[in-house]
Amino acid sequence: MVQISTDYVFDGSATTPYAADHPQAPCSAYGRTKAAGEWAVRLADPASMVVRTAWLYGDHGPSFVKTMLRLAKERETISVVDDQTGQPTWA
């Protein structure tokens, strides 16, 4: 069994990448439901796998990458957050 989850199971305060076994501390209802889903899957099948992903982009649907490319064409200067680190994931 594979559970698709998210980095929202963490509180976002880490200054280095989260390890797979880092203690969960969700700050939102969404994060809490994802954490509960992870727990339920592991309880149901100890051989299960949890895949946490974020910053998805691809050919279909909106994404940060597509938005930045569009804005770069439309504007001379664009502003983005500079206090986040992530790994864009092709989906």
PLM regions and their residue ranges:
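NAD(P)-dependent short-chain dehydrogenase/reductase
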Residues: A40-G86, W90
